[in-house]
Amino acid sequence: MTLFRIISLIAFLICFISLAFHFIRLIRLGSPKDYSLKRGNLKSAIAYSFVGAMNPLKKESAYLHLPTYTAGILYHIGTFTSIVIFFLFIFNISLAYTFQWVLICILFVSSVSGLGIFLKRLTQKKLRSLSNPDDYISNILVTAFQLFTLIALISEAFAPFYFICAGLLLLYLPLGKLKHSLYFFAARYHLGFFYGWRGIWPEKSRGYTE
């Protein structure tokens, strides 16, 4: 195992321990305490929060900006793909040539999507006013990670740069907005709990949108 591979693995362990701390903290906090009269089914509402409520047609921020929403979906697919490939690289697992190029194509599309999202945030005044340095740093690191994954799939000569980039991303992940990879699930649970307790979710026939 090369030095750079070991460094990125250490970064992963630090990241994992940090996220485990956040996870334990979430578990200890438990479910929300709601003192209003319970009117709905929590299990159905929480399930709806993760499935039905994620429909872009139910989210104003999504259906009014479908190209950006689509780019975001592609960007996340590229991120998940890159994470899987990271472990394949760590354990030196080879991929079939054809499958390797399928992954390269996926990562190319996702990287372009990430770059497009970054440029939109950079050039649109409204988005700039809502953005902070963490938004830009996170976008740059994830896009760079996808690009270096793509390049490393094409040529192993770039492996050292790939592992450096992966290590930087993993070390930054627990510090900024990227830890939403964990808090997303807690947020959807709490949202389902809140609307489920009040009997608003699952959506019935009132045309309610999130």
Kindly give the residue locations of the regions a language model identified.
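Alpha-helical transmembrane segments and their immediate juxtamembrane interface regions
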Residues: 88-130, 180-184
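Membrane-interface amphipathic/juxtamembrane segments adjacent to transmembrane helices
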Residues: 23-60
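Hydrophobic alpha-helical transmembrane segments of multi-pass integral membrane proteins
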Residues: 12-18, 66-87, 107-117, 138-150
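Membrane interfacial helix-start motif at the N-side
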Residues: 51-75
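N-terminal signal-anchor transmembrane alpha helix
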Residues: 1-32
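Juxtamembrane "helix exit" motif at the C-terminal ends of alpha-helical transmembrane segments
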Residues: 82-98, 150-155
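Terminal transmembrane helical module of multi-pass membrane proteins
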Residues: 140-210
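Membrane-helix boundary/juxtamembrane motif in polytopic membrane proteins
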Residues: 123-144
